[in-house]
Amino acid sequence: MANNNSDRQGLEPRVIRTLGSQALSGPSISNRTSSSEANPHFSKNVKEAMIKTASPTPLSTPIYRIAQACDRCRSKKTRCDGKRPQCSQCAAVGFECRISDKLLRKAYPKGYTESLEERVRELEAENKRLLALCDIKEQQISLVSQSRPQTSTDNTINGNFKHDLKDAPLNLSSTNIYLLNQTVNKQLQNGKMDGDNSGSAMSPLGAPPPPPHKDHLCDGVSCTNHLHVKPTSTSLNDPTAISFEQDEAPGLPAVKALKSMTTHQRSTQLATLVSLSIPRSTEEILFIPQLLTRIRQIFGFNSKQCLYTVSLLSSLKNRLPAPRLLAPSTSTKLKEKDEDKKLDDDSAFVKRFQSTNLSEFVDLKKFLISLKFNINSFSKQSEKPANDQDDELLSLTEIKELLHLFFKFWSNQVPILNNDHFLIYFNNFVEVVKHLSTENLETNNTTKSTVTTNHEIFALKLLMMLQMGLLVKIKMEKIKYTVPKNPKAKYARLMAYYHQLSLIIPKNPYFLNMSTTSLPSLQLLSLASFYYLNVGDISAIYGVRGRIVSMAQQLRLHRCPSAVLSVHSNPVLQKFEQSERRLLFWAIYYVDVFASLQLGVPRLLKDFDIECALPISDVEYKDQLSMENEKADKKAKKIQLQGQVSSFSLQIIRFAKILGNILDSIFKRGMMDERITSEVALVHENALDNWRNQLPEMYYFQITVNGTVNLDEIRATNQRNTETKFDKKDIILFEKKILLLFYFLAKSMIHLPVIATKPLPKNVDNATKKKQSMFNNDSKGATNQDHMILDVDMTSPAIRTSSSYIILQQATNATLTIFQAINSMYLPLPLNVSRTLIRFSLLCARGSLEYTKGGALFLDNKNLLLDTIKDIENDRLLDLPGIASWHTLKLFDMSINLLLKAPNVKVERLDKFLEKKLNYYNRLMGLPPATTTSLKPLFGSQSKNSLENRQRTPNVKRENPEHEYLYGNDSNNNNNSEAGHSPMTNTTNGNKRLKYEKDAKRNAKDGGISKGENAHNFQNDTKKNMSTSNLFPFSFSNTDLTALFTHPEGPNCTNTNNGNVDVCNRASTDATDANIENLSFLNMAPFLQTGNSNIGQNTIENKPMHMDAIFSLPSNLDLMKDNMDSKPEQLEPVIKQNPENSKNNQFHQKGKSTNMEKNNLSFNNKSNYSLTKLMRLLNNDNSFSNISINNFLYQNDQNSASADPGTNKKAVTNAGANFKPPSTGSNTSQGSILGSTKHGMDNCDFNDLGNFNNFMTNVNYSGVDYDYIVDASLGLAPLLVDTPDISNTNTTSTTSNRSKNSIILDTTFNDDLDRSRMNAREVLNPTDSILSQGMVSSVSTRNTSNQRSLSSGNDSKGDSSSQENSKSATGNQLDTPSTLFQMRRTSSGPSASHRGPRRPQKNRYNTDRSKSSGGGSSNTDNVSDLFQWQNAK
């Protein structure tokens, strides 16, 4: 107690006793008493702190004062005498004297106010949601009360109730207006609307009562006020109500929106980035535009954050890596040969199974051995230790163990098979295998075929169940095949083998024939489809989904089982089949809904076609049995439903109905409207809450006042020991968390459309003004570092204050938290956990952009995201199927961390951080650290004998040896002696230059990329023209190239049959080193010299180097076709035309080079073609306006024919922006300017802008690449339309226009002689276009036409032709697409410039044509930086 008092006194105002003062008079004491009664705040504390004295003399009576001044004296900054209970200052004016505890209070943590504001927003959103739900329920009550007949006893009650409803505020809510207007819409549709009943229809009490539920027929359009048990999506009353005529088609708004994007280049670039992200899943379709827009607002479209995010989203579309199929570790060479033979046998069986009909496998014993079943163990009651031959096979005991795991964790998730029914089949199967093992069973050929076919189908079902059990066992016991001499490593090898077999089961000819459709085969395919959903195999889901739905409809599973089966069947068998049919149908329904969610397409099974009733739960079944026993004496007959599932399975089927209804509303025509989606979201919220309230008591979860669950409690339940066995209580808790996960998943899908349909937030005017003033004040001493700060509005109030946005963020955080709580076990969910975690993590990171860096909310989100990354990493180390690849995981980690960083972080720190991440993942994969800090230039090593290398100033290495950036030369040519040099080329950096020269010589001796004269010229010319280090404060580093372009898994490491892990790792190491060493040719290959036929692949020690572009090929490779794949001979004319170039080209390997080129041509062309298409999509601003979509998708392979110079000039002057239709023949290539015929991808000279632009324009597109198509009808078109200032948009965008309209893409710009000499940073507004940045780097010119001739491999005749055509091109402006590699130039005078004051130049560029030594190369031929679109801030 003493300690408590002392602590309390320490926190109270300190009392000072003053001696020698006069005694207090009587009236003063009375005043103090009255004052203390009026102000008792500190009276008690002061009494406890005061020291009483008994001195009788007045002079010795002490006066007590407080050491701290009162609040009024502190605010007025006057001296306080500290008298108690009222100081003199307060007593003089009659104010209450108060002393607060401000000096002793600790400061609130950072972000405390923000957390309070966020909580207020959450409470307001939840209050708004609950009020809307109450409105819906009260409205339903009122509508139901109108439909029933009223009696005389409750007329007065109903009258008062109606009167109260009229006066209630719920009549004014938008929800009720939406519900009640459906009746008006129905009357308008039927043409029965008139002025008399229009007013009453709007009233909730004047609306006509709806028909009873049993007599109600839904039309899907005007009866949304009913919460249907069967959601509707089409019209039943009037099939002609929906029109698809040209003037009424629902796609017209999307077409108009896309057309209006011609004047809104910012929207065009957003659409391009969205298309590059290839949105496929439903979540990505809805949130990608908002995510990329927010990143643009904070970081910019050309930032590392945007680049890595788009790369991450694109990598999600690749097929997830399969587990390695490895052989068991052996000690002797003899055993190694045996194991190699076993691997060959396994591969042969896989190929045979895929091509041979299942009915042709007549030998059941060999078939089971090929499935790794130890049939000898089936006949032994007590198993003996397995020998070497049976060591890799599954014994009967192990099979039973894995089946137990399946029924414990998977069976309730996918209620396809009943446990009791399966045991009957399994015991029968075991008996058959026992006879096979002892070879006592002999059957004739007539019955063997049918019997073994059924047993083989059951064996395949058993294989799928064992694979699911293996996944649980490996995750639970953390089994790794890399651990030496691990006795359980065989489970990992079996998992890889079963995964390979499971992918080809639907491809067997037996299942492709619809005449063999049966319940067992459909059960097998349904199990396989659920497995594909879990591992995220998109192509397999597409292949099986439609087939199982067609088979289910063929077997009439959607009808009532009692009506389909024959009445003459055996009653026992009839009940048995009814149960199987009912369970199988609803399992297919469940799979179809989640397949629709993953694929981003409408579901196939429509609710209005279904007659099959839901199965009953085991609890209801027990109650039903007890009721039958009670009524047995009365002989009461009641129709009983067959089909029993667990209570959890019934709840997830009911949830699938709700989720299917949500998906129907997303994909329904006309639903992507902000008002409609907000109102429909409340209807779905009501249905979801009803589902939650109807959960059984053991699965029920409570929602807190702010609309979420207690996440701390969920985290606390995750602290159990995973080594202990799961009892029934743990299983119930695990299933409860899964239901929680489904609940928040549905919540996010409800509110994602609401956020997606909101207009994209626009740039703030004051932000652009601040940026403009920043540029104008640069002459006062601003440095490059000052331009790195992006002063943008960090908040978007229109979205952040939205209740749907708040609910979405709550659901996202809750989803990630629940995933972490149950991720210790393998999650048997009908969705790919890895992809789902990445998508929701991006949503969480997007929400973190709104929080204060370092605040409590920001730190909570950061910890949540970092834990999610660690969870995926742990699963990747186990090499489980369906886990994101190392490349995707690396991009995910980098993207999240980049988004969590402040926008003003220096690029050196970002690159240092990214390099650490890159080396971290290399260590995890067993690879050496990435040598991304190599001193080699971007486009290859420089030869010490190069003439150009001796003439120009060498590049300089930065002070930090760990981060080398790619700097170009500081002057363009020798004639530009008066040009200003960069500060980095002064004499103080002489030592660094010497060090760089030595390193360059060493790299050249070590076997650089190129040593031939043509390669030298190409590198010197391209490096000189692509130099951007003197123009931008940021650089695109080798770290970015290595992280984005290098495939870390190595060549064919995931699908190889080689069992030696070391060989695979060595191949990965060699490939990675090769990629890092030859970064320039990873994606520059299509743009090299014409004679370089093996441009797509470099060979090191005769090993092919695997090259991965920034966006890999889509998983559906059959949709991505290249005409050049079947035409390897078309490169021969190119080699003949340039024999000298081919002779000097170092990339033509001797000996086997020709065969290697032909063998690898298809892959290389596809890789280059993919990159080319990517670059064109990203940098072409006319992709949705001036270019025909059909020609864009169906452009044929058209080779340009050689023609005379006159024809070539005509082709140049008449070149247009649009593609020519395929029927018009071959397009005239601008590559014919140089007088050479070039074919396919070789029809461009990289050193000629016209040729390169023609190459980018005339890419051969055969077939449709559906992955790059943007579905504008799903709400993307409303997002892409930037409505304000359409009339004020100027096509010749100036700085003032960009500041006013926030336009990011500039289609054209003036580049006359005076403006071309301006410093580039004036153009580089942080919100400027990628094209504008590309213009900056295209200012520099070539030295001589001879260099151009050497680099392109053309003779002097071609140069003269090029000069002549260049003059013609100057006089006649080309109407070609504006890309990074060719910029439009106008002839407007200097008076047209509105760019403000000129900035001090960092470098001068030789833009005067009179200073060109050759005089033949025009400014239109300048090459910009190929990677400038990826230039980070």
From Swiss-Prot:
Low complexity biased stretches: 1349-1362
Record PTM: Could be the target of the SNF1/CAT1 - SNF4/CAT3 kinase complex.
Keywords: Activator, Carbohydrate metabolism, DNA-binding, Metal-binding, Nucleus, Transcription, Transcription regulation, Zinc
Biased composition (Polar residues): 20-38, 936-946, 1138-1162, 1221-1235, 1326-1348, 1363-1391, 1418-1433
GO terms for biological process, alphabetical: DNA-templated transcription; positive regulation of gluconeogenesis; positive regulation of glyoxylate cycle; positive regulation of transcription by RNA polymerase II
PROSITE patterns: ZN2_CY6_FUNGAL_1 (PS00463), ZN2_CY6_FUNGAL_2 (PS50048)
InterPro entries found in the cross-reference section: AtrR-like, Transcription_factor_dom_fun, Zn2-C6_fun-type_DNA-bd_sf, Zn2Cys6_DnaBD
Gene behind the chain: CAT8
Keyword Protein biosynthesis: no
Stretches for region Disordered: 20-40, 936-1024, 1137-1162, 1200-1236, 1324-1433
Listed CDD domains: fungal_TF_MHR, GAL4, ZIP_Cat8
Job of this protein: Activator of the gluconeogenic enzymes FBP1 and PCK1 genes.
Species in which this protein is naturally found: Saccharomyces cerevisiae (strain ATCC 204508 / S288c) (Baker's yeast)
Protein known as: Regulatory protein CAT8
Annotated Gene Ontology cellular component terms: cytoplasm; nucleus
